[in-house]
């Protein structure tokens, strides 16, 4: 948050005519059992969500004055190169290590019942580019696919791409006490106003993510 503050203050002091994009998160919203649009009530329930909301508030203060600030609110994005602290990248990295006998054939997971709106990170970056070019300053935009996937199905899809037999173990340490059961976005605004749509099929994203980790493990 302080880094965002210092950056915006520096840009303002230098009187630069520039557009600034502050990557936000769907975790600024209150939990919902339906698809979330940008007018859904704000109410983060995690420290991370609070920090992203604080960044937005700093940015909006500047957007109300002289700077052009863009506010994407990304739902779950994934893809090759993502840190294995995230669920799908963790699944893929564990499978890759099992394939090379680096670890026993057991995948440790958190909740597999959660439903998540998943967007390929490459589509997410394309959304950021489009917003920098055509987005309205101070206006939030959901970056999402509009489709929810159960994490158990995502894991099953990854396992279908390997020949190894794997056991799945629920690791209590990976369960998050304040995790939302459903996190689904409504992309209508960014679709209509910016012309951006999530294009990459989940199967392609999962394949590329698993192949990325196969390459990493073999190094």
Question: Can you name each region flagged by the protein language model?
Answer:
Residues 1-6, 12, 18-19, 27-71, ...:
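Catalytic helix-loop patch of NAD(P)-dependent Rossmann-fold dehydrogenases
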Residues 2, 46, 82, 86, ...:
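Residue-level signal for the nucleotide or nucleotide-sugar donor/cofactor binding architecture
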Residues 21-25, 45, 73-75, 110-113, ...:
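Active-site beta-alpha turn of Rossmann-fold NAD(P)-dependent dehydrogenases/reductases
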Residues 34-35, 57-116, 121-130, 148, ...:
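NAD(P)-dependent short-chain dehydrogenase/reductase
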Residues 91, 134-175:
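Mid/C-terminal beta-alpha module of Rossmann-like enzyme folds, strongest
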Residues 102-107, 128-143, 166-168, 217-219:
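Core catalytic loop region at the nicotinamide-binding pocket of NAD(P)H-dependent oxidoreductases
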Residues 121, 140, 153, 172-201, ...:
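Conserved C-terminal active-site "lid" loop/helix of NAD(P)H-dependent oxidoreductases
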Residues 202-219:
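Amphipathic terminal alpha-helices
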């Amino acid at each position: 948050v302080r880094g965002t503050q210092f950056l915006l203050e520096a840009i303002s002091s230098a009187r630069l005519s520039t557009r600034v994009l502050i990557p936000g998160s769907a975790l600024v919203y209150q939990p919902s059992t339906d698809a979330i649009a940008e007018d859904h009530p704000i109410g983060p329930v995690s420290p991370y969500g609070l920090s992203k909301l604080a960044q937005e508030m700093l940015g909006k203060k500047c957007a109300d004055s002289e700077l052009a600030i863009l506010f994407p609110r990304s739902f779950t994005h994934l893809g090759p190169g993502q840190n294995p602290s995230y669920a799908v990248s963790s699944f893929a990295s564990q499978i890759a290590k099992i394939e090379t006998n680096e670890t026993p054939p057991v995948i440790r997971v958190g909740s597999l019942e959660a439903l998540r709106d998943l967007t390929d990170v490459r589509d997410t970056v394309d959304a950021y580019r489009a917003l920098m070019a055509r987005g309205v300053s101070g206006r939030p935009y959901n970056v999402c696919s509009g489709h929810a996937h159960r994490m158990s199905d995502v894991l099953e899809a990854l396992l279908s791409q390997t020949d190894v037999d794997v056991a799945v173990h629920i690791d209590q340490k990976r369960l998050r006490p304040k995790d939302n059961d459903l996190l689904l976005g409504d992309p209508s605004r960014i679709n209509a106003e910016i012309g951006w749509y999530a294009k990459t099929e989940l199967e392609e994203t999962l394949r590329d993510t698993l192949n990325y980790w196969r390459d990493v493990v073999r190094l």
